[in-house]
Regions:
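Compositionally biased terminal segments of proteins
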Residues: 1-182
Length: 182
């Protein structure tokens, strides 16, 4: 599939993820673009963050083969795409919890190595817990209201992060959002 001005965020994620995987490189989509995918674009991200421990030289080769140009550091832009691709350094984690397994989302454009909905919720809640960022809470709610998540895992992780009170706010917000979607 060719990258052009009509390529969606999900298609771009699949194209990049598939190219990396086929080159033997491991990188997992995280952050706001995962929320965009799992919220059916209720939240609109402007970049794709692939967390990786791979060497930049190896990433450069794959990204160049797709038509991307390195902007600075670990950022890439494609002349036909509105989205930037960034490669934050590993480790892949939510709060203090490392992530060792993730989702493989099959699409028409390829397979995306991506956080699970539960991991995405935890990723967004980590921002809410650390910085009291309401936008991160809203994004966690968007994902949890549309996809099954392991609420007991999120609860125990929240407790380990000393954030049981904010977790309860999240649970109430999800209940409210689900009732408004029905």
């Amino acid at each position: 599939m060719t990258i052009n001005s009509k390529t969606t965020l999900m298609e771009l994620a699949a194209i990049v993820s598939t190219a990396l995987t086929e080159s033997g490189l491991e990188a997992v989509l995280s952050g706001g673009s995962v929320v965009s995918i799992y919220s059916d674009n209720e939240y609109q991200s402007h970049d794709l963050d692939f967390v990786t421990a791979e060497k930049m030289n190896d990433l450069d080769v794959v990204m160049s083969s797709l038509g991307f140009e390195k902007q600075s550091g670990r950022h890439f832009a494609h002349p036909s795409s509105e989205w930037f691709v960034e490669f934050p350094s590993a480790p892949l984690a939510v709060g203090n919890e490392p992530i060792r397994k993730w989702n493989q989302l099959k699409t028409k454009a390829g397979v995306i190595q991506i956080l699970t909905p539960t991991q995405s919720v935890m990723d967004r809640l980590a921002g809410y817990y650390s910085w009291n960022d309401k936008q991160n809470l809203e994004q966690a709610v968007m994902v949890a209201s549309r996809h099954p998540v392991d609420i007991s895992k999120i609860k125990s992780w929240s407790k380990a992060e000393n954030e049981s009170e904010k977790f309860e706010q999240f649970v109430q917000a999800v209940k409210h959002k689900k009732s408004s979607l029905e």
